[in-house]
C-alpha cells in the first residue's frame, strides 16, 4: 500500500524501482528518499546514509539517527507498506491527532518486528506547511512516550534515555502551557500528567527555560498551587506587556 496526500507529487517510477529491489519480497516496509520543498520554495532531497534490509533490532537505531533531524521515519508517503502487516497488527490512525498522525500509525508497525528495506529511490516531492499552533501537545507527549518505551524498554537502547528525558519534559510543559489554545484547562491537564508516575520520574527541567522550566518543576514536586501561581504570573505579565505596547503605539501615533 502507498499512501499519498492530494497535494504531494508522487514519482510513478518509484513503485517499479522499489519493487524490483532484490530483497523487496523479504520486507514489510519499503522506504525511499523524497524531495522536501520548504516554506521559501527551496528543495532538499532527504535520504539516509545506508541502504539495505534492516531487522527489528537495527530499526530503532536507524530511527533515532534520522527521525528527529529529518522526520524520515515519520512520513507515510515515501513508504510502501505490506497490507498483511497492517492487518496483522490491526494498525489504525488516531483521527483525533492534529499533528504527527503518520508517525503514530507507523510506530505501530515499527514495534511489530517489521523488516524494513531502505532504498535510494526517490518516492515523491512534498511541500512543508507551517506548524499548527492548535496542535494537541498532550497527544504528542503520549506518542513520544510510546516511542521511548519501544526504543528504551523493548529494544534496550538505554543510551537514548537522556534524549527522551529532554523530549518528554518539553512536551509535558507544552501540554500544560498550551492547553487553553485547544480549549482545555491547564490544571486539569497537569493533574492527568501527575498521575503518570513513570512519566514524572523521567521529567527534568535542566534544559528548559522560563515558564516551561517552572511547569516541569511543579509537576515533579506535585505542587499544583505553585503551578497555578506561575501560570497566573505569566499571564499577568503578558497582559501588562500587551497594554504597555498598545499605549506606546498610541503615543507614537498621537505625537
Residue ranges and their predicted role:
Residues 37-41, 63-72, 152-161, 177-181, ...:
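Low-complexity, flexible helical/coil segments
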Residues 6-119, 124-139:
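Donor-binding/catalytic cores of nucleotide-activated saccharide
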Residues 74-82, 143-149, 164-174, 200-215, ...:
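Short secondary-structure transition/capping segments
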Residues 45-46, 69-78, 121, 139, ...:
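Noncatalytic linker/hinge segments flanking ATPase motor cores
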Residues 114, 121-129, 134-166, 171-199:
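Catalytic core of nucleotide-sugar-dependent glycosyltransferases
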Amino acid at each position: 500500500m502507498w499512501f499519498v496526500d492530494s497535494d504531494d507529487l508522487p514519482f510513478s517510477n518509484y513503485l517499479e524501482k522499489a519493487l524490483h529491489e532484490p530483497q523487496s519480497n523479504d520486507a514489510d516496509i519499503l522506504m525511499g528518499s523524497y524531495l522536501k520543498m520548504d516554506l521559501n520554495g527551496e528543495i532538499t532531497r532527504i535520504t539516509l546514509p545506508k541502504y539495505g534490509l534492516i531487522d527489528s533490532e537495527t530499526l530503532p537505531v536507524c530511527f533515532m539517527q534520522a527521525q528527529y533531524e529529518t522526520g524520515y521515519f515519520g512520513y507515510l508517503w515515501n513508504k510502501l507498506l505490506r497490507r498483511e502487516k497492517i492487518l496483522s497488527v490491526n494498525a489504525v490512525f488516531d483521527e483525533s491527532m492534529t499533528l504527527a498522525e503518520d508517525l503514530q500509525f507507523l510506530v505501530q508497525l515499527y514495534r511489530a518486528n517489521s523488516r524494513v528495506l531502505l532504498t535510494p529511490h526517490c518516492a515523491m516531492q512534498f511541500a512543508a506547511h507551517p506548524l499548527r499552533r492548535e496542535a494537541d501537545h498532550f497527544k504528542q507527549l503520549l506518542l513520544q512516550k510510546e516511542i521511548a518505551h519501544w526504543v528504551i524498554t523493548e529494544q534496550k537502547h538505554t543510551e537514548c534515555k537522556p534524549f527522551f528525558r529532554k523530549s518528554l519534559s518539553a512536551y509535558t510543559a507544552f501540554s500544560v502551557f498550551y492547553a487553553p489554545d485547544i480549549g482545555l484547562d491547564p490544571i486539569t491537564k497537569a493533574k492527568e500528567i501527575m498521575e503518570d508516575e513513570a512519566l514524572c520520574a523521567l521529567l527534568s527541567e535542566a534544559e528548559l527555560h522560563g515558564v516551561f522550566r517552572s511547569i516541569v518543576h511543579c509537576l515533579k514536586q506535585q505542587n499544583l498551587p505553585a503551578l497555578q501561581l506561575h501560570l497566573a504570573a505569566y499571564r499577568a505579565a503578558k497582559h501588562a506587556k500587551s497594554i504597555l505596547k498598545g499605549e506606546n503605539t498610541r503615543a507614537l501615533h498621537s505625537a
